[in-house]
């Protein structure tokens, strides 16, 4: 970085330079280096040329062009005094409003005082006859935009580093009350040390942006509130910062694929710009903070510096980063990042493999302790166990061993079923108690269970990530597999309930088996051991001989009590053995498992049956008859159980004699032989035989004559006997019919067969689906073409109707077979001749959208839009509106709904359906539609207007004219609110940011309608006011309509609305800028029928709340700077009191704007700086001289200097009439030589008469103020400034005197500039009357000082 120089451009010429040296030679010397030649060659390729010498830049030599913008170019330059390389931004004066030039020069003087490592230093300015040259610090490595253009996209880490520095610079600017307004990659410059600097702040906001509502500059980075002309704030810079992040990450800003106007439209309409797909969650969160739509909710730069992404990127809490990223490292990281983006996916695959190695799956963890030789009953059990196993964190637990002696295989298999309880008595209370007692549970106290903080509790339970896990697979053992399998295998004839008492108990710990040396090793049971067999075999419980079964049951009943005691004893011994071992390491595991077993036992016993309670005598009878067991395998025979009923004679309990007679209940009397029934059965059999024969004769090999006879006979039989439908289906007649339809060309055969098909499938979705599956849809759809007769097409339409209204499946198959094209073809028929076909098409398309299937409606819209379906549909709408009746209204509603669905589809569909002919036809028929359907169609138009690419089609179809007329005609109808809601939204979308459409709406009379809506309809006010306020930004035609409808007075009345006062004041300022003289005159008028502009401004500033007060200061200070006469009317105590209360606002931007407003009022007043003392603001402004914000400090100091200068000269004590007297002493020669007023020369007597006439009036008329203010004010953009308005008595002399006084007042503000004649050359265009007046005043001041 080159060192900064504090020397201004007014430094003396260097002695080594030859004043008359040609510019070309100097350029040659500057361009001798290789880098300079390369830059020069690049500039030549880009069409850039070096700047011409500017005579006023006497201390600088311009070099090559670094870049071009909308308002000027930036050149590299060399300071001849210091050798420092600087950047010079040349702005053409012709591109600047004259009212802004002086403000820009004043602001540069303020911005020179700003100094921060992350902002570009302003060094001054030099004004020439054609350009304004702003001298800036030079950053040698260019912008981030150029780096991204040369090297590709930035990685997130580097963007975070750069954004950290940008936020530091932005925070400094915001603390100083400066809004950047144009943050983007091209305005973020870099140095070789990796330091980034914000450029083009302050002055950039004056020279770029929206000029007369046209897009100039960089719209892709603009915040929504800036586009909507609501005023830029510090939050607007945060939005632009988010767009810059996307620009660096993606290489392009948001919406870069769109033209500027559509991009602006999308920025305002979308919730937020599209986020980069590959961005990390932290970056996406950062962007969402930046893209808050409401600027009041948007985060500040100070808070963004604390965002995790920025903190992680910088890892520093200091205000200025201590060590910056080197430029070469930054470029290298960008190159490596883009190479990684372009590389194949092998790296990603390698990374994935490495992650798998770091986190091995659970299968490896389970098999790590498994020996190589394992004997299992079945390989399926191991696969299942491994598949659903969970990873073990430390030691492997095996619940199977915990239940080794508790649960026998027989306990896990269901016992046999018995008829009376469906469980065969094997799950009675005693049997359940016996099974429950086998788990070896010992009753433990609750205190032992409730000892928490068990580190192994989670290992005993299934993990949350593996909900299917229940019992882990046991570690295998190298043991005598044959022995253990013979003892415990699942294939034994009888599964033992538990091991004998002398069997060693072998618990599991840490995946290793602890063996008893005196006992044989027992192999662990696989999970399949406890799996219930799908084929139920209960041969161990049920014997072929019932005597054996009875003995077993009696034995079970006798030994139940002893078994329970024995099992309990064994379970206690098991628990004691396990507890004695586990006390060393994990004493809580056994207790926890035992308590869980105990709780399971209690729960099972709650639901156990009691055989003593099994008394069904109330159902089976009091005799206690016992049922014999069925001999079947399943043991369940529903017919063996009969309820006890009152009809005992027919009951099986009372009538044992008929038990062996299976036909006892069928002893009904048979009727005598019915002759008629026999004839009917015989006729039906012959009919069936006939139909089957006809169906069998339907072959493609038959002659067409024969096929014609067969089809006619079949149709006749089917019409006479509809029940033959099932016969045709059972005879597989559908396929032969389809084959003949596909090949036959005789239309009579086709018609007969189509009628048969429609009759068969009518209202039978199963047959329809079968027909679809065998390919019937495309065959029958073929007959819907226009080449076939009307009768055949009607049958095809009937088939189509069945397809789209029966089921979702048939609809999907109909669409997949090209059915939508058939519907569109029906729509294209003539409504008069083929009304039925057209209505089938309308109802078909409506049914397609109404059926709730899996296919999105957008897909249907896209398919139909390819066929331009809305064109014939709009024609049908016109014909339907000509009819009356319920059917016509239903069809009208369905057509409106179809249009509305198309407007909700994707943008591509909207563009395809927005044809001028369709829109024109729809808009034409709007008035004839019923109110409900009219609102639906207006929603269709509104949705189309939300897409920028459809606005031209809407304009070409006279949408604004039709909608304005419809709004006018429905203003007194009950549905006006709903209609106006849609219309105002549409007109707002169309007129926003487009002058031609704004003028079109104004010419169609939208302005008085909107004004009426604002006064009467409160909810609709929010839709009408944006359109009205935008009218001030339109051209001459729109403003002419505003003048005709008192638009300026309407804007003034809006200043009392806290929600719209900022927008209204901005509209007044824009209007004043366009038509300065006329608007100023009306603003200065005092009328009895409306409040004055001055009173409205004072009331607005006095009553406005916090946010509204901050936002209104920016347009107000612009307006006062543009019109000093208006500013002079605001020198009021109540206004200064309110400004004094806000001078110590927390935001530097508010304090700075307040000081600017006070400065504008003081400059326009006769008392100048004396107003500060008069209204008690002097002390408050003195305190601001020590403000932390540099610009506030500097502005306050200049105001204090103005006040002190005014006091020293005593101007505040001079009366206004004394000053007028001195003005009248100007010699006639000087007056004759003045060239400011273009008025005829009058005699001295007329001048004197005018002077005395004006002197008699203590307050000059406002019209005279307005006229005098025009002398040195820039003309409006509509044309040259009108002539000077004369005084009240029509004399020009009084006007001329007021001109001189206005000039003196305005010249006093020049003193705020540095008193350097070199800084502002004499080439500044001023009227000749200014210089004599200024010299005379200076002499008068010198005399007073002496």
From Swiss-Prot:
SMART domains reported for this sequence: S_TKc
Domain of life: Eukaryota
Cystine bridges: none
Residue stretches making up the Protein kinase domain: 60-310
Biased composition, class Basic and acidic residues, residue ranges: 35-50
Cofactor: Mg(2+)
Swiss-Prot/TrEMBL catalytic activity: L-seryl-[protein] + ATP = O-phospho-L-seryl-[protein] + ADP + H(+); L-threonyl-[protein] + ATP = O-phospho-L-threonyl-[protein] + ADP + H(+)
GO cellular component: cytoplasm; cytosol
GO molecular function (one): metal ion binding
EC code(s) of this entry: 2.7.11.1
Residue stretches of biased makeup (Polar residues): 477-489, 1220-1249
Gene Ontology BP terms: actomyosin contractile ring assembly
Residues where ATP binds: 66-74, 89
Classification via Gene3D superfamilies: Leucine-rich Repeat Variant, Transferase(Phosphotransferase) domain 1
Region listing for Disordered, in residue ranges: 1-50, 342-380, 446-497, 1211-1295
Catalytic residues in the record: 182 (proton acceptor)
EC top class, as a word: transferase
Record key words, sorted: ATP-binding, Cell cycle, Cell division, Kinase, Magnesium, Metal-binding, Nucleotide-binding, Serine/threonine-protein kinase, Transferase
Described purpose of this protein according to its UniProt entry: Required for early events during cytokinesis including localization of cytoskeletal components to the cytokinetic ring.
Family: Belongs to the protein kinase superfamily. Ser/Thr protein kinase family. CDC7 subfamily.
Protein name: Cytokinesis protein sepH
Gene: sepH
């Amino acid at each position: 970085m080159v060192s900064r120089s504090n020397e201004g451009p007014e430094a003396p010429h260097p002695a080594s330079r030859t004043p008359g040296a040609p510019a070309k030679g100097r350029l040659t010397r500057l361009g001798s280096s290789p880098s300079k030649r390369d830059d020069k060659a690049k500039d030549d390729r880009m069409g850039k040329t070096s700047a011409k010498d500017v005579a006023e830049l006497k201390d600088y030599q311009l070099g090559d062009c670094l870049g071009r913008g909308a308002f000027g170019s930036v050149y590299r330059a060399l300071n001849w005094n210091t050798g420092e390389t600087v950047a010079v931004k040349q702005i053409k004066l012709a591109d600047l409003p004259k009212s802004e030039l002086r403000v820009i020069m004043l602001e540069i003087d303020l911005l020179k005082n700003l100094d921060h490592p992350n902002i570009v230093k302003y060094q001054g300015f030099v004004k020439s006859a054609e350009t304004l040259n702003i001298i800036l610090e030079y950053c040698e490595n260019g912008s981030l935009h150029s780096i991204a253009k040369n090297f590709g996209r930035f990685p997130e880490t580097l963007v975070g580093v750069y954004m950290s520095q940008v936020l530091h610079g932005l925070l400094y600017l915001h603390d100083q009350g400066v809004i950047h307004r144009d943050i983007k990659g091209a305005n973020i410059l870099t140095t070789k040390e990796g330091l980034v600097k914000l450029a083009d702040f302050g002055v950039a906001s004056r020279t770029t942006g929206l000029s007369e509502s046209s897009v100039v500059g960089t719209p892709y980075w603009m915040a929504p509130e800036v586009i909507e002309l609501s005023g830029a704030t510090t939050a607007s810079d945060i939005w632009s910062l988010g767009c810059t992040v996307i620009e660096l990450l993606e290489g392009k800003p948001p919406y870069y694929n769109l033209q500027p106007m559509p991009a602006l439209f999308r920025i305002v309409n979308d919730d937020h710009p599209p986020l980069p797909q590959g961005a990390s969650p932290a970056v996406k969160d950062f962007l969402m903070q930046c893209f808050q739509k409401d600027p009041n909710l948007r985060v500040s730069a100070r808070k963004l510096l604390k965002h995790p992404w920025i903190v992680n990127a910088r890892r520093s809490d200091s205000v200025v980063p201590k060590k910056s990223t080197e430029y070469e490292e930054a470029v290298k990281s960008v190159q490596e990042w883009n190479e990684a983006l372009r590389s194949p996916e092998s790296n990603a695959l390698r990374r994935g493999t490495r992650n798998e190695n770091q986190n091995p799956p659970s299968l490896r963890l389970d098999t790590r302790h498994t020996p190589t030789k394992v004997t299992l009953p079945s390989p399926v059990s191991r696969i299942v166990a491994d598949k659903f196993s969970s990873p073990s964190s430390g030691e492997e637990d095996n619940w199977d061993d915990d239940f080794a002696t508790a649960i026998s295989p027989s306990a896990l298999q269901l016992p046999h079923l018995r008829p009376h309880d469906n469980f065969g008595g094997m799950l009675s209370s005693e049997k359940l108690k016996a099974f429950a007692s086998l788990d070896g549970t010992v009753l433990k106290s609750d205190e032992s269970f409730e000892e928490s903080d068990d580190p192994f509790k989670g290992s005993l339970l299934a993990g949350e990530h593996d909900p299917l896990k229940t019992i882990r697979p046991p570690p295998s053992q190298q043991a005598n597999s044959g022995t253990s399998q013979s003892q415990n295998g699942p294939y034994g004839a009888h599964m033992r309930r538990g091991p004998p008492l002398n069997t060693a108990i072998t618990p599991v710990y840490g995946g290793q088996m602890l063996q008893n040396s005196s006992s044989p090793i027992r192999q662990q049971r696989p999970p399949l051991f406890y799996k219930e067999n799908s084929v139920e075999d209960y041969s161990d419980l049920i014997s072929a001989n019932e005597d054996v079964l009875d003995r077993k049951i009696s034995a079970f009943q006798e030994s139940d009590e002893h078994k329970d005691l024995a099992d309990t004893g064994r379970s206690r011994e098991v628990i004691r053995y396990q507890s004695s071992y586990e006390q060393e390491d994990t004493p809580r595991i056994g207790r926890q498992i035992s308590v869980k077993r105990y709780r399971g036992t209690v729960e099972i016993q709650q639901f156990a049956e009691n055989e003593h309670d099994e008394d069904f005598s109330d159902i089976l009878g009091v005799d206690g008859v016992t049922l014999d067991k069925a001999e079947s395998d399943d043991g369940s025979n529903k017919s063996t159980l009969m309820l006890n009923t009152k009809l005992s004679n027919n009951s099986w309990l009372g009538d044992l004699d008929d038990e062996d007679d299976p036909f006892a209940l069928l002893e009904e009397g048979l009727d005598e032989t019915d002759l008629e029934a026999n004839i009917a059965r015989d006729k039906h059999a012959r009919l069936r035989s006939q139909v089957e024969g006809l169906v069998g004769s339907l072959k493609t090999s038959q002659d067409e004559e024969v096929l014609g006879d067969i089809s006619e006979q079949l149709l006749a039989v089917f019409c006479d006997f509809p029940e033959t439908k099932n016969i045709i289906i059972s005879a597989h007649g559908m396929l032969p019919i389809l084959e003949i339809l596909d090949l036959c060309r005789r239309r009579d055969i086709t018609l007969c067969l189509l009628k048969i098909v429609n009759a068969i499938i009518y209202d039978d979705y199963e047959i329809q689906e079968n027909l679809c599956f065998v390919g019937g849809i495309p065959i029958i759809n073929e007959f819907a073409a226009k080449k076939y007769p009307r009768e055949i097409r009607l049958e095809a339409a009937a088939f189509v109707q069945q397809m789209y209204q029966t089921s979702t499946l048939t609809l999907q198959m109909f669409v997949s077979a090209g059915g939508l094209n058939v519907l569109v073809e029906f729509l294209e028929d003539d409504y008069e001749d083929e009304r039925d076909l057209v209505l089938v098409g309308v109802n078909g398309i409506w049914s397609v959208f109404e059926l709730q299937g899996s296919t999105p409606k957008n897909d249907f819209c896209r398919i139909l839009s390819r066929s331009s379906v809305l064109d014939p549909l709009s024609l049908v709408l016109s014909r339907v509106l000509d009819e009356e009746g319920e059917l016509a209204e239903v069809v009208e509603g369905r057509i409106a709904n179809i249009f509305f669905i198309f407007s909700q589809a994707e943008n591509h569909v909207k563009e395809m359906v927005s044809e001028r002919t369709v829109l024109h036809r729809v808009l034409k028929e709007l008035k004839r539609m019923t109110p409900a359907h009219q609102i639906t169609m207006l929603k269709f138009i509104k949705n189309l207007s939300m897409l920028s690419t459809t606005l031209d089609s809407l304009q070409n179809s006279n949408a604004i004219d039709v909608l304005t007329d419809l709004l006018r005609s429905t203003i007194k109808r009950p549905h006006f609110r709903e209609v106006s809601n849609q219309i105002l939204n549409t007109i707002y979308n169309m007129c926003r940011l487009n002058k031609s459409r704004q003028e079109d709406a104004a010419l169609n009379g939208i302005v008085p309608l909107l004004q009426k809506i604002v006064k009467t309809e409160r909810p609709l006010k929010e839709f009408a006011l944006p359109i009205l306020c935008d009218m001030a930004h339109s051209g001459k035609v729109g403003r002419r309509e505003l003048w005709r409808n008192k638009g300026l007075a309407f804007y003034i009345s809006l200043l009392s609305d806290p929600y719209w006062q900022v927008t209204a004041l901005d509209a007044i300022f824009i209007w004043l800028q366009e038509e300065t003289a006329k608007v100023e005159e009306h603003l200065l008028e005092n009328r009895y029928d409306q409040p004055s502009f001055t009173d409205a401004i004072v009331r607005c500033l006095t009553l406005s709340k916090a946010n509204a007060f901050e936002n209104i200061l920016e347009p107000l200070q612009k307006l006062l700077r543009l019109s000093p006469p208006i500013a002079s009317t605001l020198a009021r105590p109540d206004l200064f009191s309110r400004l004094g209360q806000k001078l110590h606002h927390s935001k530097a931007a508010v304090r700075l704007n307040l000081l600017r407003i006070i400065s504008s009022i003081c400059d326009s007043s006769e008392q100048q700086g004396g107003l500060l003392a008069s209204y008690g603001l002097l002390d408050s402004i003195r305190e601001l001289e020590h403000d932390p914000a540099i610009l506030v400090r500097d502005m306050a100091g200049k105001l204090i200097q103005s006040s002190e200068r005014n006091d020293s000269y005593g101007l505040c004590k001079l009366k206004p009439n004394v000053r007028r007297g001195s003005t009248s002493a100007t010699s006639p020669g000087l007056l004759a030589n003045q060239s400011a007023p273009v008025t005829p020369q009058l005699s001295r007597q007329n001048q004197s008469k005018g002077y005395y006439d004006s002197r008699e009036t203590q307050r000059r008329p406002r019209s005279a103020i307005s006229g005098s203010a025009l002398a040195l004010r820039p003309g409006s953009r509509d044309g040259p400034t009108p002539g000077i308005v004369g005084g009240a008595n029509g004399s020009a002399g009084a006007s001329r005197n007021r001109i001189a006084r206005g000039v003196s007042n305005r010249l006093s503000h020049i003193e705020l500039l540095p008193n350097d004649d070199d800084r502002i050359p004499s080439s500044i265009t001023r009227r000749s009357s200014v210089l004599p007046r200024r010299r005379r005043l200076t002499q008068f001041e010198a005399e007073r000082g002496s």
